[in-house]
Amino acid sequence: MYRVLAKHDRPAPGGTGPSWWSFIGHTTDSLWSVDLFRCESIVLRTYWVLVVMDQFTRRLVGVGVHCGAITGVDVCRMFNAAIHGQGTQRHLSTDHDPLFEAHRWKANLRILEIDEIKTVPYVPLSHPFVERLIGTMRREFLDQVLFWNARDLERKLAEFQVYYNAARSHASLDGHTPLTFAGGHTMAPANLNHVRWVSHCRDLVQLPTAA
């Protein structure tokens, strides 16, 4: 069926209507996206990172960390740690990773009363925002720092989360940060005659700001 649709079912280009993804995630915290990626410590131990982001504001909601092989139980623990203190949302988008098909994962979502929305099979571009966030975390942060263990990784990712949500502007948000976009704040014109530099992520990132 997939091969037949991929070959013959080609939608006409130039559609102007919103996608179902945009329709569901049109307000803050109405749709969160979740995905996993892997990284290595300074002693070459493998760590898995679960990322939760808000679709509408691009806000990094939280992360969960696990060392070594991962199971459905571990994914539940990581997800619960990532959203701790954040409340819950109605919808959650995940891909077709077998870890997101595990019985414990499904049961955890039922307990939290969260509706799971699956991406299109074999189409990575159907999960673009969280994939881009993971790429940003790798390029701008994890590729530039070293970490020793899970606690060290969690601490450094928490610093990146503060920077990403409060200081890093996004072109798709018209230059806003996720926090200012969520709050509906207007961007005042900057006085470029008085500029100071603010460091983030332990001086890894330096951003100019109006003094």
Which residues does each predicted region cover?
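Charged DNA-binding/catalytic regions of mobile-element recombinases
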Residues: 1-211
